[in-house]
């Protein structure tokens, strides 16, 4: 049999130089590029160290103190520590809130919450995808095709933003809810640049007898730092990913109310919340098997980092940087949805320029700027959207401040101008447009400027001096 020292204690570069080389190339891409995808961030070396630890070896189906496998005494300690840190990071009273830290990521967390709270074909309402919502909130196309499992297994009716202002139309939301009578009302989104009126959501939910769930995946870091409105004041359940503005590993959490319910007309005296057992059962055994303990350990590290004064400074800077970028683009005459932002992202409406998000995303990719095409309210297709979504968390993690984001705005303006020039010369069809991207000196110059700019900032998670590909 092959000795352990041969297969089990040999470095990656020796065992699999091909994968090692691709990882090094990805490091270079991250270091030399400008990362503007709003759902991405750069996590810390400490988090990465926990992710690559021996915790990945252990199975631990069940919850601390009630496992289906032995040998979990330290895994139980880690998960309990992660849960207590999660409640502390989000300023939750442990007597009033519980949390499950086992979901593999945000979409599984959402579906586990729905499975716990609803019966198949119960009614839900979430923000429409072109209005800034998320697939898991019940999205289906204008033609009625059900895209998300949420819309397949539950009856979904979206609410929307006002097409003039870009803000959520709470009056129409209430009107729809009174007609539709959902069992669950969802607030939260993936491309909504404004804060959420949780008090209004609560009032609407109470009017129609619905539970209120917040998906704070995008803004959880801002919520933890108290730089965004607090969903825990009004919601019954709060879900989140952990790798976006929270700057942790890729994982998910479900927070739920527990203990006595506040007195309410028509409610039995002494009523208590019954979410805990339902949510724990939905996560396991209903939808998942063994938790990913390396993720839970890494999440515990990230939550410890999130509960520091330095993280609050970071979250505040994320918002300031997003505002600075939005203001710069508007100063150049570009159309920004809602005329600005109150959180970590800017949604740029390209339709007045006659461009699609696909083309701008593709050209930016070739210039080492990473952002994503995104639907804008009024779009008929998420596959050919009229905007791009731009986020501040990742580059803020590298130490950039407002003036740096104004420079990023200048790069983006150059990219859009170049996209317009190529479209004018080669045509609107994507196959024709792509021809203008080949051997383009202006594009090459923009890429060189972007990479020179980005390489001057530090990189979390790994040492640039130890990279294989430095140039």
Curated annotation (Swiss-Prot):
HAMAP family on file: SHMT (MF_00051)
Similarity comment: family membership: Belongs to the SHMT family.
Organism: Arabidopsis thaliana
Pathway in which the depicted protein is active: One-carbon metabolism; tetrahydrofolate interconversion
Cellular localization per UniProt: Cytoplasm
Chain positions found as N6-(pyridoxal phosphate)lysine: 244
Name of the protein described by the UniProt record: Serine hydroxymethyltransferase 4
Residues reported to bind L-serine: 39, 61, 69, 218, 244, 389
Keyword Cytoplasm appears in the UniProt entry: yes
Domain of life: Eukaryota
Activity regulation statement: Inhibited by the antifolate drugs methotrexate and pemetrexed.
Subunit structure of this chain's protein: Homotetramer. Interacts with UBP16.
N-acetylmethionine modification, residue list: 1
Gene Ontology cellular component terms for the protein in this record: cytosol; plasma membrane; plasmodesma
E.C. number: 2.1.2.1
Sites where the protein binds pemetrexed: 39, 59, 61, 105-107, 134, 190, 218, 290, 389
SUPFAM superfamilies per UniProt: PLP-dependent transferases
């Amino acid at each position: 049999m092959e000795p352990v020292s041969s297969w089990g204690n040999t470095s990656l570069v020796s065992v699999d130089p091909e994968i090692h080389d691709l990882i090094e190339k990805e490091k270079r891409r991250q270091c030399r590029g400008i990362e503007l995808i709003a759902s991405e961030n750069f996590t810390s070396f400490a988090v990465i160290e926990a992710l690559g630890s021996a915790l990945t070896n252990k199975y631990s189906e069940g919850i601390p103190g009630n496992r289906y496998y032995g040998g979990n005494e330290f895994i139980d300690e880690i998960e309990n520590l992660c849960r207590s840190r999660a409640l502390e990071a989000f300023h939750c009273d442990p007597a009033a809130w519980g949390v499950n830290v086992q979901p593999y990521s945000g979409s599984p967390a959402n579906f586990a919450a729905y499975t716990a709270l609803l019966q198949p074909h119960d009614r839900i309402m979430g923000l429409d995808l072109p209005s800034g919502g998320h697939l898991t909130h019940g999205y289906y196309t204008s033609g009625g095709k059900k895209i998300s499992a949420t819309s397949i297994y539950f009856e979904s009716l979206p609410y929307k933003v006002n097409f003039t202002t870009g803000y959520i139309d709470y009056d129409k939301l209430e009107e729809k809810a009174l007609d539709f009578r959902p069992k669950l009302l969802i607030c939260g989104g993936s491309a909504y640049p404004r804060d959420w009126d949780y008090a209004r959501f609560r009032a609407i939910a109470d009017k129609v007898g619905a539970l209120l769930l917040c998906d704070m995946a995008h803004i959880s870091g801002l919520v933890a730092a108290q730089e965004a409105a607090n969903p825990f004041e009004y919601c019954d359940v709060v879900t989140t990913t952990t790798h976006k503005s929270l700057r942790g590993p890729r994982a998910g959490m479900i927070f739920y109310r527990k203990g006595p319910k506040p007195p309410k007309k028509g409610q039995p005296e002494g009523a208590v919340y019954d979410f805990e057992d339902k949510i724990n059962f939905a996560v396991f055994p209903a939808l998942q098997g063994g938790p990913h303990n390396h993720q839970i350990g890494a999440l515990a590290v990230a939550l410890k980092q999130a509960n520091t004064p330095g993280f609050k400074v970071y979250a505040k800077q994320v918002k300031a940087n997003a505002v600075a970028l939005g203001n710069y683009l508007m100063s150049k005459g570009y159309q920004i949805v809602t005329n600005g932002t109150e959180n970590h992202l800017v949604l740029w409406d390209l339709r007045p320029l006659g461009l699609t998000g696909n083309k701008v995303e593709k050209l930016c990719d070739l210039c080492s700027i990473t952002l994503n095409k995104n639907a804008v309210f009024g779009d008929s297709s998420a596959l050919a959207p009229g905007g791009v979504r731009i986020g501040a968390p990742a580059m803020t993690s590298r130490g950039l401040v407002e003036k740096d984001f104004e420079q990023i705005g200048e790069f983006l303006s150059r990219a859009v101008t170049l996209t317009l020039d190529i479209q004018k010369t080669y045509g609107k069809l994507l196959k024709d447009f792509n021809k203008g991207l080949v051997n383009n000196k202006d594009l090459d110059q923009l890429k060189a400027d972007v990479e020179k700019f980005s390489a001057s900032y530090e990189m979390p998670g790994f040492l640039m001096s130890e990279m294989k590909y430095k140039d």
